[in-house]
Structure formats: structure tokens, C-alpha cells
């Protein structure tokens, strides 16, 4: 009889664990743990501007939140929310699929590429690029010119799409084969040349994929990748650090450049790669499935502090 009772108890414990009736169950009465990117982040800029809290895009003072978690990259945000059942943050839509997080409906609209293109999902921003206004040698300048042309081809656009970039690939877009003869540098051996890429961590995966593919089309040119945030884009190509040891030949930003103030880039040296969206995200165990602009503002300004005020 004792053996039967013991086996029954063990079975009940096991079943309870499978059913989630332990203390691992999501408790909506728990405190909300808020995460944000650092103040130099383009994703942060796009998020707070998008929800109508633009005063917080470069300043933590408007965020009246105890225990605010600040992370330095898209990857750090993903890891933080994956390890915090009660956390909420925001990431690039291009990173959502492989993140292991739940992307919340925003203003009742699912975060999908289709909904971005049709204009119903509105928490969006551009992925932008900037190049140097002058180079250390003509070869680098010619390689960058060829790379910019590659971005407008069917192959380049398809790669951006495959990495989560939102844009149309048209049959009228040129193929690389149809334009490569215009860029003689690509037919040379460029294996002793290194192009320095950097900037936004949200754009890093896309930029690396584009560089890997273009290297094969451009005489095996090398690319060095160093991504620490959108603020590096102007600073290390045309700004204060353009001649430092950490200079960049081409850089990427997940926000628009401040052309009328601190980032007065030379005309013709910057542009847009594609559209991206920003997605509010929570842990998979969180029962919240959608969020509004007003709710996000109230969370990040300390008005809402418990999950049961949202769910």
C-alpha cells in the first residue's frame, strides 16, 4: 500500500510539473520589469518617438521607473527578456523570428511585413547607411560605389528581405550581372583590401550577409565588422572619429540622421536600405498578447507597475 501511495504521489508531482501548476506559472499580479536600450540606440529613438514619448529617446529622466534595465544591443535585449518572465522591451522586427520571444500586437495589429507594407502596423523606422566623404585610397572608394550599386539589384534586395528588411524586389530592378561591367574594380583581386563596416546592432546581421555575398562578386575583398550602435554611424565615417583607429568606411543606423544638427552629413553620402519595424516583446510565458501606445507610455512613465493593469 505504501508503495502504491508513493508512486501515486510521484505521479501527481510529475503531472503538476507538466501542467505548470508550480510557482513557474505566470502571475499577473507581479511587477512589470521594464527594459530599454541605451541612449545612443537608434532602436530606442524609433521606439520612444513612435509611442509619443520622444523626450525619452536620449534621456532616462522621463522614465519614472524603478529598476529600469538598460541594455546595449538588440541581442542583449533578447537575452534579458528570455530570462525574465515579467520583463517587457522592444526589438527590431528583423530579429523577432529567431528571438524566442513573443511579439505583441501593437494597437491591435500583428507585427508582420505585410502589415508594415500596407500601413496598418505603424511602429516603424528606416534602416539607413552612410559612407565616408573621402577615402584613404581610390580602390576603397570604388568598392563602396560598387557595393551601393549592388544594394539596388535584385540580389541585394533579396538578401535584405531574407534578413528581415521590408522592401519590394521588382522585376524591373537590375541584376548584378547586368551592371557589374560598370564597376571594373570588382573584376580585380581585392583580397588585400579591407572595408570597415559598423554602426547599428539591429542592422548588423543584414550588413554582414550583404558583405559576405558581395565579397565573392568583388575579387574577395575583406570586410571587418564592428557594431556598437547607430551613434557610431556618422561619428566614425564623417564625424569626430572619422580619422581614429576605429574609423568606418561605411556604417548603418536604425534611425534617421540628425542632418539639421549634430550629424551634418555631406549630400549624396547617405540613404535608406529598407524599412524595419520595432516590436514590443515579452517572455513566452507572459499571457499578454497585445499592447497599445497609451499603455506603453504609462508603463515607461511609472503609471502602470503591475501586469494585471495591462492584461
Language-model segment annotations:
Residues 21-311:
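Exported/periplasmic ABC-transporter solute-binding proteins
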Residues 16-20:
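C-terminal motif of bacterial Sec signal peptides marking the signal peptidase cleavage site
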Residues 11-15:
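Alpha-helical transmembrane segments
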Residues 1-8:
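Bacterial N-terminal signal peptides that target proteins for export
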Amino acid at each position: 500500500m505504501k508503495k502504491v501511495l508513493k508512486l501515486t504521489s510521484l505521479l501527481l508531482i510529475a503531472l503538476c510539473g507538466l501542467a505548470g501548476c508550480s510557482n513557474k506559472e505566470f502571475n499577473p499580479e507581479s511587477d512589470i520589469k521594464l527594459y530599454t536600450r541605451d541612449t545612443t540606440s537608434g532602436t530606442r529613438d524609433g521606439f520612444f518617438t513612435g509611442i509619443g514619448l520622444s523626450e525619452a529617446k536620449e534621456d532616462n529622466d522621463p522614465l519614472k521607473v524603478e529598476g529600469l534595465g538598460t541594455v546595449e544591443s538588440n541581442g542583449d535585449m533578447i537575452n534579458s527578456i528570455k530570462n525574465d518572465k515579467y520583463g517587457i522591451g522592444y526589438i527590431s522586427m528583423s530579429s523577432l523570428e529567431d528571438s524566442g520571444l513573443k511579439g505583441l500586437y501593437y494597437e491591435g495589429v500583428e507585427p508582420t511585413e505585410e502589415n508594415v507594407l500596407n500601413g496598418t502596423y505603424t511602429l516603424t523606422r528606416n534602416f539607413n547607411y552612410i559612407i565616408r566623404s573621402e577615402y584613404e585610397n581610390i580602390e576603397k572608394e570604388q568598392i563602396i560605389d560598387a557595393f551601393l550599386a549592388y544594394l539596388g539589384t535584385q540580389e541585394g534586395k533579396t538578401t535584405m528581405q531574407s534578413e528581415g528588411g521590408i522592401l519590394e524586389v521588382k522585376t524591373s530592378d537590375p541584376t548584378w550581372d547586368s551592371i557589374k561591367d560598370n564597376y571594373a574594380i570588382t573584376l580585380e583581386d581585392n583580397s588585400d583590401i579591407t572595408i570597415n563596416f559598423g554602426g547599428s546592432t539591429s542592422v548588423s546581421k543584414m550588413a554582414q550577409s550583404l558583405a559576405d555575398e558581395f565579397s565573392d562578386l568583388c575579387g574577395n575583398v575583406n570586410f571587418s565588422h564592428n557594431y556598437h550602435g547607430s551613434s557610431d554611424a556618422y561619428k566614425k565615417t564623417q564625424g569626430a572619429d572619422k580619422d581614429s583607429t576605429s574609423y568606418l568606411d561605411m556604417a548603418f543606423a536604425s534611425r534617421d540622421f540628425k542632418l539639421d544638427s549634430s550629424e551634418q552629413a555631406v549630400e549624396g553620402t547617405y540613404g535608406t536600405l529598407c524599412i524595419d519595424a520595432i516590436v514590443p516583446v515579452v517572455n513566452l510565458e507572459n499571457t499578454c498578447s497585445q499592447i497599445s501606445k497609451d499603455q506603453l507610455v504609462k508603463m515607461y512613465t511609472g503609471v502602470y507597475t503591475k501586469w494585471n493593469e495591462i492584461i
